Every structure is written in structure tokens, then in C-alpha cells.
Amino acid sequence: MQFKPAVTALVSAVALATLLSGCKKEEAAPAAQAPQVGVVTIQPQAFTLTSELPGRTSAYRVAEVRPQVNGIILKRLFKEGSEVKEGQQLYQIDPAVYEATLANAKANLLATRSLAERYKQLIDEQAVSKQEYDDANAKRLQAEASLKSAQIDLRYTKVLAPISGRIGRSSFTEGALVSNGQTDAMATIQQLDPIYVDVTQSTAELLKLRRDLESGQLQKAGDNAASVQLVLEDGSLFKQEGRLEFSEVAVDETTGSVTLRALFPNPDHTLLPGMFVHARLKAGVNANAILAPQQGVTRDLKGAPTALVVNQENKVELRQLKASRTLGSDWLIEEGLNPGDRLITEGLQYVRPGVEVKVSDATNVKKPAGPDQANAAKADAKAE
């Protein structure tokens, strides 16, 4: 029992030492560091807004070959699917009946002409009346007209190509009877160079474009506004550039769209009528567009686009955005970001609004090559 005060003093000393040691450790613990984020400084850029519209190709000219006289087809003088020239003979219809009609018309003309000349001499001698001479002269004129008609009918037994182009399959073979005025075409010729591309644009897109042009948000694309590029079904770009020809003046009630027609050179006949394509049209120029990298744009629970930016105090701010479309790897921002804003694209998972951060240049975003970097970008997303 004599050692109890000594033990108590020893325990107190150890506890005091432990307490002092803990205080020193707490004082030595470093303060929490601000998280590191990568940012992109928003700069206005100029770009040409393009619209990619679906459409189909159609022949520049189409001619259905039909007979203009009745008869039996003796020969087909073309190869199906080949190129034919205007005026080239395609079919030969049996000319026998028309040759006989022509010979008869020639003989009739000789007879009426001879009678008219003889009456002309006799009328001077008052051997015939003026009425008889007029009747003879009228018969001569009728005979001349009959001769011309017979010559035309005989010429029509040679069925000629009305236009140059590619001819399709023949609907009639040798030995088939054809007639003037029949509804079925003997063959169809289509001119493929140049070729039309008919595309459709919704009235909503058309109205928005007009409002943007009127408000000054977009400027007209200039002299090249009517130029059109074509994307084929396999995703390749057609090497020839076309030109916008016209726009329909009425809206299709069933689809709510307007038809636009473009004309493309087609020397190699790469484009065939009926092909499905996409046409890229230049709509307008935005000289001060705000483009934000997609890495810096997220969605909230409602699906609305948002972004985190670093303010002048190096603190994180939440911005609500209005993004109209994508341009390559960027979003076109209409509201929510301004020139000079520092948009966070790296370290988003480590920060929240109001937190102070350390800022460095982002490494996950390529710097824009220049003010016209987005000129060739495709507008491939609909308005939010």
C-alpha cells in the first residue's frame, strides 16, 4: 500500500505525455489542398452553319419512247442499258403500208397538179369556169398535204431517240404490234449528266434559320451559299459539288416540309436515279460562336445541359446551358457561357459548386486551329 501514491503519479505522467503528443500531431497535420482541374478558356469563333438533309436523285431529263404510227416491230436497234444519242434510230416498224400510201399520194399529186395547170390555161381562154379552176387548184393543195402526211408517217416508222441518255429495257420485242397513242412506252431514256437531287427541309428548321438571319445571329453565307455537297449511302463524299437550283413555294401538307432541288455534274454516272443521299447545304455564318468541348458539358437529372466554370476567385460555378447542336467534338452554345469563361473539362468528379480549385490547362481537349476551325464541321444534332 505504500507504493500506491507512486503508481498514481506514474500513470498521471504517462497520460499527460500522451495528451501532449496528440496535440503536437494535430498541430502538425497539413491543411486539405484545393483539387486540381483542367480548364479550357472559351473564345468566340467563326463557323459556317451547314444543314444535312435527306433526299433522292432524279434524272435531269426523262423521255418515254412511244410509236407515232401503227405497225409491227421489225427490228430493235439498240442495246438495253446503253448510251444513245438524240436522233439515233431505236426501232424499225414495218414500212410497207406507209410506202404504198406515199406512192399513192405522189401519183395523186401529179394528177391534181396536171389538172390544175391545164385548167389555168383554159380559164384564160374562158373554156372553163373560175369555179372549176378553183376546185382543181384546191385538190392540188390537198394532194400536196396528203403527200407530206404520207412522208411523215413513213419517217415515223423509224423510231428515233428524242434525247441523249441511257436507255432502259425494251418493253416490246420484234414482232410485237404497236399503235399510235398507246399508253405503254416502248422504252425509257434518262439523261444522267447532270442529275437532280431533291431534298426536303422541315418548316421548323426553315423558320428558325430565317429568324436567326433576321436577328443578326447568323449572316448569309455569301456567294457560296448555293453550293451543295453530297454524301452517298456508304458515307463517302461525292467528288462533284452541286448547286442549289430552286426551292418549292409550297409546303407539303403530309410531311410539313419544303422540297429543295440541287443540280450536280455526273460525268461518270456514279449517281443513278432513285439513290438515297444526304445533301450538305450552307445555311449561314456565325461570326462569334461560342463552342464548348463536349468533355465539359454534362446533363442534370432533367436532361438539361450544364457546365462547371472557374470564376475569378478560383471557385467553381454551375452554369445552365442552352446548346443547339454539335459541331464535330464541340457543342454550339447559345446561352450560359461567355468569352473568357474557364470551362472545366478535367477533374469534374472531384469538384462541386463553391469549391476553390487549382487551375491548369486541360490536356484532354485539342486547341482550336483557328477562327475557321468549325467551318467544315457538320451540324449533326437537333436543337435541344
Swiss-Prot record:
Tell me where the signal peptide lies.
1-22
| Family, similarity comment | Belongs to the membrane fusion protein (MFP) (TC 8.A.1) family.
What keyword terms does UniProt attach to this protein?
Answer: Antibiotic resistance, Cell inner membrane, Cell membrane, Coiled coil, Lipoprotein, Membrane, Palmitate, Signal, Transport
Mention any one GO cellular component term assigned to this protein in its UniProt record: plasma membrane
Residues carrying the lipid (S-diacylglycerol cysteine) are C23
Q: What is its main location?
A: membrane
Function description:
The periplasmic linker protein component of an organic solvent and antibiotic efflux pump; confers resistance to toluene, hexane, p-xylene, ampicillin, penicillin G, erythromycin, novobiocin and tetracycline.
The membrane topology term of the UniProt record is:
Lipid-anchor
Q: What is the gene called?
A: mepA
Name the InterPro entries for this protein.
CusB-like_dom_1, CusB_D23, MFP_Efflux, RND_pump_MFP
Asked if the record carries the keyword Coiled coil, the reply is yes
Top-rank taxon of the source lineage equals: Bacteria
Give residue spans, biased composition: Low complexity. 368-378
| Record keyword Secreted present | no
Q: Which GO terms describe its molecular function?
A: transmembrane transporter activity
Q: Which Pfam families match?
A: CusB_dom_1 (PF00529), HlyD_D23 (PF16576)
Task: Name the segments for region: Disordered.
Answer: 362-384
- Which spans of this chain does the record mark as coiled coil? 115-155
Q: What is this protein called?
A: Multidrug/solvent efflux pump periplasmic linker protein MepA
| Residue positions bearing lipid (N-palmitoyl cysteine) | C23
Name the Gene Ontology biological process terms.
response to antibiotic
Its localization reads: Cell inner membrane
